[in-house]
């Protein structure tokens, strides 16, 4: 919880960082430099939960690159070490670390498989492609379908996963620097398991489509109590609002257009929720957010709709929400009508359509 609180404070401070792409250093250069100070904009405190992945069989997963290639990780285990870096386009520590990722790829891209995996939280393929171009990323760039993020238990980006030739996790953490560099070298020196490679099978991700009944999904209230997303038949249709407590403030420093959309979405929902014809509920992303941060947000913004924290990311994954802000429209039978995401200008029309369908 201290880690999340620390990261939340860092995010809300909106520290601007000039993260323009730099030329790739020579392979013999130091990989990712010294460990950062907690006062550095690129610093993120380590999550002890990630360390529990060390020694576990890596996930059997096929990733699809932004240029259409499929990468089956299971085909690599036992043959090559694998380094997966999870990141987001707007994340300041992710941007700070990108030169280090380029160095690692320049040094060891011919000896291990290195993949930049976008976490698909507040991003889409257009933003990811532009970021890869701006930051001169030449390794495969993919977008997670939600299963890798779920398996990792990710609550903040970036996340580094270093996997040895035996298919087991050597390192899982947020920071680059000496510890990551040592893990990369350990992976390169690793040997395949003599009796084959064990993997972790991930459950298929089921995303709701129009007409599907909304399942009960556990959330957290701002006081840390367990609550359930409204579901089942009701006399009124429902609208579920998806956003993040930090998207207006934090993204203002890296993606001001996206921050403006978050603000517009919040203001639209505030107005639309004033009527009594639709039941509203808000779901806030768990990324970089603890219940205390949600409580602070509620105190500051005084939202007219009740809010819940998507503490495991299950609600965002179940509804397939990738962009902020978003609204899911639900009929009186508790079935999904449609999802509108990333474009708050369409919210009012969507709500009018839902009201007319009663």
Feature annotation, model-predicted:
Residues 83-84, 114, 160, 239-240, ...:
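Hydrophobic beta-strand anchors of alpha/beta hydrolase catalytic cores
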Residues 115-118, 241, 280-284:
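Short beta-strand segments
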Residues 129-165, 281, 292-330:
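Short, internal strand/loop/helix patches
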Residues 27-39, 43-44, 162-213, 323, ...:
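Thiol-/selenol-based redox modules, centered on thioredoxin-like
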Residues 61-82, 217-239, 267:
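A short beta-strand-turn-helix
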Residues 1-19:
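Sec-dependent N-terminal signal peptides
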Residues 57, 80, 155-157, 213, ...:
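Short, small/polar residue-rich loop motifs at catalytic or cofactor-binding pockets
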Residues 86-103, 242-267:
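Conserved redox-active cysteine motifs that mediate thiol-disulfide chemistry
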């Amino acid at each position: 919880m201290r880690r999340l609180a620390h990261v939340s404070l860092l995010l809300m401070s909106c520290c601007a960082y000039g993260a323009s792409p730099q030329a790739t250093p020579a392979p013999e250069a130091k990989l990712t430099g010294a460990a950062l100070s907690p006062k550095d904009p690129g610093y993120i405190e380590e999550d002890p939960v990630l360390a529990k992945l060390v020694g576990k069989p890596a996930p059997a997963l096929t990733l699809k690159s932004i240029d259409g290639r499929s990468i089956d990780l299971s085909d690599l285990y036992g043959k090559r070490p694998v380094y997966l870096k999870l990141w987001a386009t707007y994340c300041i520590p992710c941007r700070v670390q990108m030169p280090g990722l380029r160095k690692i790829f320049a040094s060891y891209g011919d000896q291990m498989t290195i993949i930049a995996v976008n976490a698909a939280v507040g991003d889409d393929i257009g933003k990811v492609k532009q970021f890869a171009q701006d930051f001169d990323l030449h390794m495969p760039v993919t977008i997670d379908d939600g299963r890798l993020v779920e398996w990792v238990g990710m609550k903040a980006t970036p996340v580094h996963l270093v996997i040895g030739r035996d298919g087991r996790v050597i390192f899982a953490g947020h920071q680059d620097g000496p510890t990551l560099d040592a893990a990369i070298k350990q992976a390169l020196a690793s040997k395949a398991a003599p009796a084959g490679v064990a993997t972790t099978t991930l459950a298929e991700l089921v995303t709701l489509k129009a007409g599907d009944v909304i399942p009960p999904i556990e959330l957290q209230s701002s006081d840390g109590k367990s609550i359930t997303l409204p579901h089942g038949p009701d006399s009124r249709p429902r609208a579920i609002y998806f956003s993040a407590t930090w998207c207006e403030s934090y993204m203002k420093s890296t993606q001001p257009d996206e921050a403006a959309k978050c603000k517009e979405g919040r203001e639209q929902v505030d107005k639309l929720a004033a009527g009594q014809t639709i039941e509203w509920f808000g779901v806030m992303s768990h990324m970089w957010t603890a219940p205390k941060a949600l409580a602070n947000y509620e105190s500051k913004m005084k939202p007219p709709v009740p809010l819940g924290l998507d503490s495991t990311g299950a609600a965002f994954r179940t509804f397939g929400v990738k962009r902020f802000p978003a609204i899911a429209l639900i009929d009186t039978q508790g079935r999904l009508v449609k999802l509108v995401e990333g474009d708050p200008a369409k919210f009012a029309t969507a709500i009018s359509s839902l009201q007319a369908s009663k």
